[in-house]
Structure formats: C-alpha cells, structure tokens
Amino acid sequence: MAATYRLVVSTVNHYSSVVIDRRFEQAIHYCTGTCHTFTHGIDCIVVHHSVCADLLHIPVSQFKDADLNSMFLPHENGLSSAEGDYPQQAFTGIPRVKRGSTFQNTYNLKDIAGEAISFASGKIKEFSFEKLKNSNHAAYRKGRKVKSDSFNRRSVDLDLLCGHYNNDGNAPSFGLLRSSSVEEKPLSHRNSLDTNLTSMFLQNFSEEDLVTQILEKHKIDNFSSGTDIKMCLDILLKCSEDLKKCTDIIKQCIKKKSGSSISEGSGNDTISSSETVYMNVMTRLASYLKKLPFEFMQSGNNEALDLTELISNMPSLQLTPFSPVFGTEQPPKYEDVVQLSASDSGRFQTIELQNDKPNSRKMDTVQSIPNNSTNSLYNLEVNDPRTLKAVQVQSQSLTMNPLENVSSDDLMETLYIEEESDGKKALDKGQKTENGPSHELLKVNEHRAEFPEHATHLKKCPTPMQNEIGKIFEKSFVNLPKEDCKSKVSKFEEGDQRDFTNSSSQEEIDKLLMDLESFSQKMETSLREPLAKGKNSNFLNSHSQLTGQTLVDLEPKSKVSSPIEKVSPSCLTRIIETNGHKIEEEDRALLLRILESIEDFAQELVECKSSRGSLSQEKEMMQILQETLTTSSQANLSVCRSPVGDKAKDTTSAVLIQQTPEVIKIQNKPEKKPGTPLPPPATSPSSPRPLSPVPHVNNVVNAPLSINIPRFYFPEGLPDTCSNHEQTLSRIETAFMDIEEQKADIYEMGKIAKVCGCPLYWKAPMFRAAGGEKTGFVTAQSFIAMWRKLLNNHHDDASKFICLLAKPNCSSLEQEDFIPLLQDVVDTHPGLTFLKDAPEFHSRYITTVIQRIFYTVNRSWSGKITSTEIRKSNFLQTLALLEEEEDINQITDYFSYEHFYVIYCKFWELDTDHDLYISQADLSRYNDQASSSRIIERIFSGAVTRGKTIQKEGRMSYADFVWFLISEEDKRNPTSIEYWFRCMDVDGDGVLSMYELEYFYEEQCERMEAMGIEPLPFHDLLCQMLDLVKPAVDGKITLRDLKRCRMAHIFYDTFFNLEKYLDHEQRDPFAVQKDVENDGPEPSDWDRFAAEEYETLVAEESAQAQFQEGFEDYETDEPASPSEFGNKSNKILSASLPEKCGKLQSVDEE
C-alpha cells in the first residue's frame, strides 16, 4: 500500500465501506468504486464512485479523545451501538438501525433502474424524470435490495441511480431503538416525512447530475457494463416476481380480515376493531417510518444533515388520518412489509447487545419521559406496532414508579427467553404478529419468576396503589368486546398458568388441568351471549392486556372484574404464593403446549359461532365433549379448592398427554440445572385438541361418530351430478339421423365420437364396443344402449377408455387390446399415409407403439394397464393430440414414426440372420460392445420380463429389444432405472449389495486394464457411488434410492457400460451438476438419441441413393434432371427399409 497511515477505523458491511478519522492527513481508504477522496490526501485502492461523499465531512469533534473501536462496533447485521461510557451515538446521538432502512426518493425503484439501464446500454437517447413522474406507480415506494455474493460491488450502480445506500458507515440514520436517547424527546405528534423530506431530497440533485454520474460510471468502468446490466435485470426480475407473489398473498389475507371485521364490528365506531387497526397500520406503515435522505454529490452542498434539528422539527408535522379499510382492495406494499421486518430485527439486535450485561447498568431514559405520554404512546403504536412492546413496558414502569426495586431495564429484558448457547440471550425470530402479545406475556412472567425478590417487594407496596392499579385494569377490561375479552382472558390464564411451580405434587397438576377445563367451559358459555357493541381502541386493548398481566401476576390475590365473569385466584396462584419457587423450564414448555391447545380450542369455538369452523358441522360431538368437561370439572372442584401446604420437592413432574384424551401419564424426572434452555413451544394444529378432564383411566368416554365418513375412493371416476346424460343421448340420436340408414361405419364414427365429447381416435374402440366389428356398421339403437350403460357405470375418461377397449368383464388392458386403435391410427392419420404402400410395416409400427405405451404407462410391470396407471400417465392426452397434429413425428411420445425407424434399423443391424430374434452374441455387438457381458447375461436370464411372459432361452424378440434400447439410451427414465436395477439385483432381494456391485465392476476393471487404463480401486469407487446415491441405509442401495438421487445414469454406466463411464469421467463435473439441477422442459436422453440417429440414418440413405444414381448415370451416359433425381432418391429411401425387412410376422404370431 502506497499511503502511510496512523489509524484506520472501519465497520464492514455489504459494500465493504469504512468510516475515516479525519484527524490524520492520510489514511488507507477502502471503497467500492471511483473515489473522489484523492483531493483530500486519502488513497483509494479500488475503483469507486461517490459512495464516501458524506464520510469526508463527518464532524471531527465527535471522535476526539474517545475509543473509536468502542464507538463503531462492527456487526454482522450492520448494527453498532455505543454503550457503556459513551451515552451518545456516533452520529449526533442517533442510533444506527439495520442496514437497508434508508430514505428512498419518490420515484419507483424499478422505473429508475430500468430507465437508467436502458440509457447506459444505448437503448434510449435521453434520461428524463418526466416520464417517471407520469408513471402509475405509487409516489412513495421503498426499493428492495437483493443481497448476493456475486453482486458485491456491481450493485453500486443501482444504488447510485435509486438513492438507496447503506447506513452502515456511509450515511447517518436514525430509528426507534428502545435504548437510545431519541425516546427522551416528546413523541406525541410523530408523523411521516412524506412531503417535507421528499421535497428536501429532490432539491439536492437534478436530472443533469444524475445523467452525468451515469456517464462517468460507464466511462470509467465500461468494460463491465454488460455484466452490470445483466445483474440489474436479474435483480429487477426477482423483485417483480416476489412482489407479485407477496402482493397476491397479502391481498387475500387482507380481504379475509376486512370481511370478518366489517361483519362483526359496529358501523358507528369511531375507532375500528383491532383487526381493522392492524390492517390500517400495515398500509400506512411506510409513511410513518422515519428515513434520512442521502445527498448526491453536489458542489457546495457536502455538509451532513443536522439530525438534531430534523428531530426537533418533527412534532410540527400533523398526523394524517387513516385511509378507509381497503375500499379499493389495495394491499400493503411489498417493500413496506419487508422494511418492517428489517427494522424489527435491527431493533432486536441492539437490545440483544444491551442485555449481555443485565446487572451492570440500569436505564434511566424511561424516567425522563413526561407523565402525559399517553397520546405519544398511542401515536407510537399507530406509527410502528413493532415498538409497542417497549413503550408499553415503559409506560407500566411509570405507573409503578414508587416500586423502586423493579427497574426499566429488567422489564426490557423480560421480553426474551434465556438460552444457553454462547452464554448470551438469543431471540425468537419466528414470532408472528398475531401471536406476538401472548408469547410476550409468557416471557414477561418467565423473567419475573427469575427475579422473585422483585415480586415479593411489589406485594408489600401500599394498598391504595394496588387498588388503583386494579381499577385501571378493570376499567380497560370492561370496555372490551366479548370476542376480544375472550382472548384477553385466555392470555391472562395462560400467563397465570406459567407461574405454576413444578415442585408441587401430582395432585397440584391435576388441579391445574381442572382449572383449564373449567376455563374452556366458561369461554364456550361466553360465546353464547351477544357480542358487545362497544369497541375500544387497539392501544387500549394491548395496554390493558399487558398492564393487567403484569399487575395480576405481581399481586396474586387481587380480583379482576368483567361483565362476563369474575376471575378469582385459582389453585395455581396459591401454589405460587405458598412455594415461591422458580419454574422449571422443561415443565413450562409442557404447560405451554397445554395452554396453546386451549387457545386453539377457543379459536375453534369462535369459528363455530360464526359458522366457519369444523365444529359448526359437528355440534353433536361438541355437545359430548362439553358434557364430559363439565362433569369432570364439577367432580374435582373440591380438590382444586383444597389448600396447598407441601414443600417443594427435589424432583419435578412432567405431564405427557397422549392422543387418547382420557389417559394422562405422570413421569418423575430429575431436576435440571437452572440454566437449561426452554425448548421452543410446539406448533399447535389447526384442529382443536380438547384436553383430558381428569387423569383417571377408568373414566373412559367413548364418543360415538356423529357423522359417517364420506366416500373418497371412486375406481370408476367421481360421478358428475351436474351432467345431463339424457341430453347427450339425444344429441347422439340426432347425429345418427344425419347418417344414411342410421348405420355408421368406422369412418362415420368420428362424428359420433365428437358428439359424445371424446377425442377423434376413440372411434375405433367405440365401433368395436357397439358390435360394429361383426356386422361392419353400428346402429343408433345399439350405440345408444352401449353409451347409456357406459355413462351410468364409468365417470372419467380413463375408466371409459378401458371399458371401450378391454375385453368383456375385464378391468385392464393387455397388449393385443391396442391393435384396433393403432390400426385405425395407421390407416387414417395424415402423417402415416405413406404406409399405405407398405402394409408390411403396419404390424411392426404397431408393435413398437404398443411396447412404448407399456414401457411408459405400465409402471407395475404386470403386463396389464389399469385405470389408475392410465390416469397417472399422459397417454390419453397424447392420443387426443393426434387429432390436432398432422406431423406425427412431432408427437415424440409413443407415436413418432422417426423413433420407430431408429429402433427397427438398430434391430435389423444386430439381427444378422433376419429371423426377427437376436442372440446374446448379437446383442453384445450393440454400440461396439460397450455393454459388459455380465449385464447381457442378466438381460437374457429373464430378469426383465413383464407379466407372465417367459424369456425364450438365448433369444430376444423385437418387443424385448424396444425395452432394451430405450433403457440403454435413457437411464434417467423411471422404467429404465427399474430395468437395470432388476438386472443388477442378482439374488433378487431388492437390494444392491456390495458383492453385487463388485461382481459387475470386476469386468469393467479387466476391460480398462486391457485398454491400458488404470482402474480406480473398488473401495474408492464404492465410496464415490455411496456419496452419489446417498442410500437411506448404509451399505444397501435400493430402487427408491436410485430413483431419488437423480444420478442413476452415472451409477449404472459405471458398472456395465465402459464407453459411457469413460465419458462421464472426462466430463466437466459442473456440467453434470447443471444437468441435475435443470428441471426445465428439456428433451429426454431418448429423444436426443433418436433425433441424432435418425439424422445419421437419413444421411447414410441419401449417400447410398446418390451413389446408386451416379452409377446408373455412368452406365447410361444420360444426365438426369433434378426433379427426376429427387423422385428416384425418395423412392430408394422409402424402399430401403422394406428391402431389409423381408417377411414380417404379425403381433399375434409373436
């Protein structure tokens, strides 16, 4: 490095930028583009452009006489918080939030980037903002940045164009961190910076400056403009796809929430229900998040923005009213939702850093908040619901200010679960917005249990204070609607149960379960009462919920009143009062699962009330369950009321609830260490799971089934109740009227098939099923009678097709059943008209198509195709496609004549004596003896026969050769994988053992040594194959393993095809991986092979025809015209195969 330096202070983020200490004249400066810092005496080692403009003008006074390493803490998420001895943050006391929380300009990200990319690539002549101003996008959108390793420094172009920069050392930012001094300022009039900051930001640059910067960038770094454009387009495509998917999902959710809120709420409420407020907050969230503008480099305007002045001016902004509840059905913006989660995680990360030292310091910022902070708290909730947790806790600390023992820092820390990993507190980032409050309450109680001295002190607080607090909770609780009150009581009970002391006996656990059952019954009773019309605000609900939770836990004997019920202290609160023990984490998790089941049960009751849940259809079952719960609760009520005076024991009890709701097992487990982490709560299923009333095995209640299980298996297809069979039959009768004498031959049956709604080439099966094969025609009466019976008994295409084509009283298709259908295709399809002059080819083409059908469709290898196999295949769709496609070679599945031509030519080359059978020696000559002799022996041993067919010893028919050729050339096909697995499974146990693999690899080694190639030792090869296949059971490779690994073709070629094995060894491994990952509609290996071989065969035939034509011209000395030459060559090409064929046998003769 050329420049000398004395000190470098850096925070690493996505762009590897740094913060420079300007006390020194020279410093090593790392940046990501063309840098403008050369004039300041700072050397830059990377080409950079305008990223560090603001860094050169950071006030130096902030860094004097301070430990810069503690001021700038590098962090993975771009978070750095100044703690300990430095109460002020690095940038004028403002904390830095998660990267990406930057202020965007008013133009759309994709529009600006698209216009700029087009301008830079020369597609447009000028770049203007007028076009962007007239776009249909929203005026204020947050761009979404995609993080990619390959997009490290090239993405500066997008940031340059869109004003989207990192906060991590490049530009100052601020946010709503709970530990910062920002909250010391009045927050009562917070609002968005939509208009003011936007206009302020747009004054800092103009169109000419932006175009100039674009030109400078591409002049300096023009060699990579193509790469930049490609990466930009990739990112824009990804953003648009994600935006569309996320928008559709949000739109559906919002529409559902909006409908339920409007139907259940009151139209005269000035403040809607919590769901409505939630939706409004989601739509308006972007407007209320504070963002800082980033200034483009301007001459004379390089000073940083005074953040303190900006914050002081914020209270003057007025709060804009909420928009209607999605009257236009517009969901929240995708960027808003993403930004919300980003800022949330950043806020959590800072608290995580602060909580590393829970006992070393106390937060005093809460005490400086004014007492009249109710409005500010409400505004804060409206602006950002994620910050509600922190502010609510602070508000409660104000209410309990005389209680000096509980500090605000302790309350902040109660929001997290203690983990053992790394000795630090980890965050549960999987919390959902809807379930957030309930989980938060659980965590508050957990932490309060860890500090029992605070709770003890609070119990000793003055009685007037307790009464006042109880009134606050009672007042807010009374105003709740019934539905919301149910959820609040659920969370109160849930938090109360979490304080259950695990040192209690089995009897105490029974009492707890009884309380839960009683609570479920009370919730169900409350649902029968009319819903209250009075709705409270979202802040009141959440605030009263959290306040009541905290205060009721701290004062167990206080009573809570509500219009629904009086919640009296239960047995578990007495247990807490008596024992005062710390709750064991494992039993807490078990109880949490029980409580979540109760919540699911309550949710199902709500849906039952609104006729939306599954219980609304099973009211008889619900009645039985409720009677069981009521009886059990009354029977054990006296047990719950009995006082608890036992001391804590050394062992704790764990409750295990089985699927049978009558049995509960109690297991005693040794007490774990206090540091044992709490396991994550189990995810509750959507269906309700009623808990057991009492752990008595003899009280078994067998609930009878209230409804019959509906039929779900239809072997002949699902009946269509909407179809009108008589109307169809009348149309068929009318169609027969147009036919002479109302007698249709096989050619007229095409019209009848279309009237029946069937593909054209169903006409031959219909003709045969109606008895036309015997008489040569079909009458209207016979066909209508047959079709009426078919419609009544068969309801889908697969079952109808098998009924038409199969033998009488047969439910499956055999090979000979396809002959009439395929013969009709050969006779009538326009792509096979040339076969009329070569009838000897008909049987061979039909045989090939039949074998290809069974190869693909008959996955059971039974030799009989069932309706299930027809449904799973694409045969009926391909058959219907014959009607539309005139070129039959375009239908590569089953019917391609080119594929038949390739198969038969390959067979003809191996069949030296032309007896239509090939021997083992003949097959070994295929592809220059590429296949090993041992695998060929296995083929001729009968390992791959289908159904009841018997392998003729030492002979392979043409039908068997079709299976061999397709399997050899396409080892990725599922049938091919099973074909070769059967061959390699010598002992037939369904597993390829190491001995079988070694048996086949030995011959490969011998052949490689004969060629002068040193083979890989079997042990090393075996390790490679096991890594390739990754079998489920070590040392045993099954058919399922090979079908799952998607590399079966390499596995098989390694053991019995030397030529392809060597090709795989010499091929680029990255190309192999690319083939594996490519799931697009690529042609199969068989399609590629058939196309290449057909081109080769046609070229050979053409060369032979030209040679023969030249020889005839030499003898006659008469030149032939081009037309005569073309006609002769076509005749030779079409006649070449019949000359090879000789006398062909029919399918029946085989």
From Swiss-Prot:
Residues 758-793, 972-1007 form the EF-hand domain. GO terms for cellular component: protein phosphatase type 2A complex. PROSITE patterns: EF_HAND_1, EF_HAND_2. GO terms for biological process: eye photoreceptor cell differentiation; negative regulation of canonical Wnt signaling pathway; positive regulation of canonical Wnt signaling pathway; positive regulation of protein catabolic process; protein dephosphorylation; regulation of canonical Wnt signaling pathway; regulation of cell migration involved in somitogenic axis elongation; somatic muscle development. Residues 676-693 have a biased composition (Pro residues). Residues 661-693, 1105-1132 are annotated as: Disordered. PP2A consists of a common heterodimeric core enzyme, composed of a 36 kDa catalytic subunit (subunit C) and a 65 kDa constant regulatory subunit (PR65 or subunit A), that associates with a variety of regulatory subunits. Proteins that associate with the core dimer include three families of regulatory subunits B (the R2/B/PR55/B55, R3/B''/PR72/PR130/PR59 and R5/B'/B56 families), the 48 kDa variable regulatory subunit, viral proteins, and cell signaling molecules. PANTHER family: PHOSPHATASE 2A REGULATORY SUBUNIT-RELATED (PTHR14095), SERINE_THREONINE-PROTEIN PHOSPHATASE 2A REGULATORY SUBUNIT B'' SUBUNIT ALPHA (PTHR14095:SF3). This is Serine/threonine-protein phosphatase 2A regulatory subunit B'' subunit alpha.
